[in-house]
Amino acid sequence: QPMQFRNPRRTLPFILGIAAFLALVLLPDLPDTVDPAGRAVSLSHEGKAALGLFLLAGIWWVFEVLPVGVTGVTIGVVQSFWMIRNTRVALTDFMDPSVWFILGSLLIGAAFVRTGLTRRMAYLMLTRLSEKTPIIYLGAFAMTATLTLFMAHTAVAAAVFPLLLVIHNMYEPTGRPTRFGKGLFIGMAWTAGAGSIITLLGAARGAVALGFYKELTGSTVSFFEITWFMAPLGVLMVFLLWIYVSLVFKPEKSEVPGLREKATELYAGLGPITKREIGTILIVGAVITVLTARSFVPAL
């Protein structure tokens, strides 16, 4: 947005980020510190610049001064300009396989949302739910976690949000804030994070972590291998979060009458599955097959 910097809420953090970076870059040399082995460790000019860049990026990200991608590119440019790292090394990292994997997972999420597959799956799941509020909690959280198996958790949260609004409007037609509403939306955010650790498609951190792991150890972890270890933890976290939310945000009412009928009506309103939706399913299925092929054929 061309006018965004006229907003003090963006301008001040923008200046603060630059000031934090320059303050650390221009900081006088600090005394050496001593590591546990007794060796003296000094903070170089590149080290100070790296710390300043960390603060700059963090401030800009937290306050949404610039689009996330623009800030990300700025990190690489600043590293080159201030000679924090060699230009070739700094900019080549943008072509790392983990970066492209993250981009791919975001595109899968965008395809699901754009074609309406996310809504179709969500409405279908709701038609199978009980109208008891604790079960609605469980169903909404399980649905959120399930969707994060195939698409980025941020895309899932954006897709599920309108659906939860429908549920809450049926629970409280006046729109008044309720404990149930707080639990529904807070729990959705938490379980999106919990479910996203199960597969590499759920969040960027998994792919990045595996990239670091391969760089440090030389070993690779397959798509199914990480799911094998993370699935029990992810499922347990979702279950514990459901219990916690049910206790802390105990609903004022015991049920939401007509929820199943409303979900059935919304699902019917989508009509039969379209060619675009079928095509998306086939393409995503083919992508996942390629990603997991090495688990079955190690020679690949």
Show which residues each predicted segment covers.
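Short, hydrophobic transmembrane alpha-helix segments
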Residues: 25-43, 59, 63-65, 88-89, ...
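Transmembrane alpha-helix interface/packing and boundary motifs in multi-pass membrane proteins
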Residues: 57-67, 143-152, 189-201
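Hydrophobic alpha-helical transmembrane segments
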Residues: 23-28, 58-63, 146-149, 271-272, ...
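Helix-loop junctions at the membrane-solvent interface of multi-pass transporters
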Residues: 27, 62-63, 81-82, 129, ...
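Hydrophobic mid-bilayer segments of alpha-helices in multi-pass membrane transport proteins
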Residues: 11-21, 46-84, 96-107, 159-163, ...
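Juxtamembrane and boundary regions of transmembrane helices in multi-pass small-molecule transporters
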Residues: 3-32, 114-117, 173-190, 194-209, ...
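Membrane-embedded alpha-helical segments and adjacent helix-loop junctions characteristic
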Residues: 35-39, 56, 69-175
